[in-house]
UniProtKB/Swiss-Prot annotation:
GO terms for biological process: DNA repair; DNA replication. Residues 607-694 form the BRCT domain. Its EC number is 6.5.1.2. This is DNA ligase. The gene is ligA. It comes from Mycobacterium leprae (strain TN). InterPro entries: BRCT_dom, BRCT_dom_sf, DisA/LigA_HHH, DNA_ligase, DNA_ligase_AS, DNA_ligase_CS, DNAligase_adenylation, DNAligase_N.
Amino acid sequence: MSSPEADPIGPEVLQQWRKLTEEVREHQFRYYVRDAPIISDAEFDALLDRLTVLEEQHPELCTPDSPTQLVGGAGFMTDFVATEHLERMFSLDNAFSGDELNAWVTRIRAEIGNDAHYLCELKIDGVALSLVYRDGRLTRATTRGDGRTGEDVTLNARTIEDVPERLTVSDIYPLPEVLEVRGEVFFRVVDFQALNTSLVEEGKNPFANPRNSAAGSLRQKDPAVTAHRKLRMICHGLGHIEGFRPATQHQAYLALRDWGLPVSEHTTLVNDIAGVQGCIAYWAEHRHEVDHEIDGIVVKIDEVTLQRRLGSTSRAPRWAIAYKYLPEEAQTKLLDIRVNVGRTGRVTPFAFMTPVKVAGSTVGQATLHNPSEVKRKGVLIGDTVVIRKAGDVIPEVLGPVVDLRDGSEREFVMPTTCPECGTTLAPEKEGDADIRCPNARSCPGQLRERVFHVASRSALDIQGLGYEAGVALLAAQVITSEGDLFTLTEKALLRTELFRNKAGELSANGKRLLVNVDKAKTAPLWRVLVALSIRHVGPTAARALATEFGSVDAILAASPEQLAAVEGVGTTIAAAVTEWFTVDWHRVIVNKWRAAGVRMVDERDTSVLPTCEGLTIVVTGSLAGFSRDDAKEAIVARGGKVAGSVSKKIAYVVVGDLPGYKYDKAVELGVPILNEDGFRLLLEQGPPVQQVVD
């Protein structure tokens, strides 16, 4: 069959060809790269046929890179071509102390006075990216590079869920003709961990930290690889812009959000340096409540006119600074891997390392969780490893520095018998990652850990019964199990040197311990349930069980189906609770505690009225009279629920200092907002409470 005779190419034909080519390439990209087609195969075939016919009629349009000449996803490869930014992409100057921050404030006040407002943002530990939109359509994505020229990674950026292909038209902020927006590409911690797991399963080296993995994933030659890695992005600044001029940085973020671009929920506008310092202090304590890595707070002058007056140096804007927290990662030598037996019998490998200073404290040990995790992380004894200590979180080994290996490293071999009691180790069931010691009742290691857990803050919170005290009581056989804790006497404590003073009498610590043990007998039922060391039962599930059933006896009598039906419990926890109560010696512990006077029923304070019953409440910012846990406890105790995000279903948003974008979201959705006084009023009298904000 001969080809149709070639016709002259007119402007309409050329426009039609360009439109068809663009459509076909777009759908090929969605199908082969993003794995997320939006039209059927038949519809795509029809588009491709139309393009093929058009090129047969006009052979000069049929170029080697036409979709009709390429197979499948061919042609979608990132070449990292050097590309100039429309406007220079600066770095930030850093402050590592309060003095350095104050010095920056002093410098800028000398030029712009004291009337400026400050915008505080989380400094995301990721990789910088610049997006360019023309008439609302994404046309280019470029890495920072040297600030003037970066690498074109447009195809890869298009696979990021948060990066819109087209901007949303806003009723408030006009779409710019040209918009160059800057942001940070990163991994959520949970997605980083999942990526490393898959890499190890494929026999590849895992990434040492989320930042490295974000950079590596963004710079893949094959965009399909990037598409299958769950990169995220948050925008934090503007470059070149035509057709819109925000008056403030805060207004710019509101506009970006309206246009469908991702902005942080945790940006806070403050009036003075005291507000800045408060923000820095707050996030130093709460930084690990965010689902991605942060390494500081970025402080910016909010007013754009003042930003222009301050200008920039050769590398950084003078109107912004990054306050950096103490580094949470460090490199050190992995000297050995040894195992520890936990309270539920799980045998956990621990890394023993050359002590190193990280996040303000010295770290020499870190958990490796289980043998599968050791393999997933790819660490060998003798490796130089990257460790992380996140605030109060237990130190963690992130991975090895493979380039520093010298061949002397060796693999860790999991022991086959318990190091505490000699019992053969095994997974509880086939396929489990955790290896356990089945000698639950009498294994010294498990017994020690259970006693320590009973006294922990999340359980009965018995001051004075720390690890050393628990070991001493067991060693002197003052107690033989956690069941004996509530029958402690002065005479029994005198058998341990730890609780005797020089005169041979009971020490002050011993007296305090007896008082605190007695006090723990009246703890709420949920704390008793946590203290029993039932697998999977933490404070949340324990509260739900205590509220629903009201007593240990009722929980014991409930069927697995009844337990699982409780919100916050589910089938896994229900099965664990049912199984725990079938063990004879477990019931012996319950009966010993009951006989000693431990409260086994949920005796609720009748003075606490159910003022929040049926309400779902969000708490954001820092409250003066409540810790975050106290506020949650107060709401739950009154029958309410606590949510982590704002939606139209939320009854109230309680706002403290530095509330961030949850406050803005509440305003946008019309959700009632309460300050701390309003919150107290709600707790006391229940709804309706008139919106109360400062």
